[in-house]
Swiss-Prot record:
Protein name, per record: Stationary-phase-induced ribosome-associated protein
Tree of life domain: Bacteria
Gene name of the record: sra
Assembly, per entry: Associates exclusively with the 30S subunit; there is 0.1 copy per ribosome in the exponential phase and 0.4 copies per ribosome in the stationary phase. This is also true for several other K12 derivatives and strain B/R.
Induction data: Induced upon entry into stationary phase, this is controlled at least in part by the RpoS sigma factor.
Length: 45
């Protein structure tokens, strides 16, 4: 399934992938919207 990862995130089937990167299609243009996830740590002193 790892080789099929790009196709799955374009179709939005894999919720882990599609949460990280959403394909937004409006009219004839498609853009990739990144939702940054992970640790949001405060700045180190």
């Amino acid at each position: 399934m790892k080789s099929n990862r790009q196709a799955r995130h374009i179709l939005g089937l894999d919720h882990k992938i599609s949460n990280q990167r959403k394909i937004v299609t409006e009219g004839d243009k498609s853009s990739v919207v990144n939702n940054p996830t992970g640790r949001k740590r405060p700045a180190e002193k």
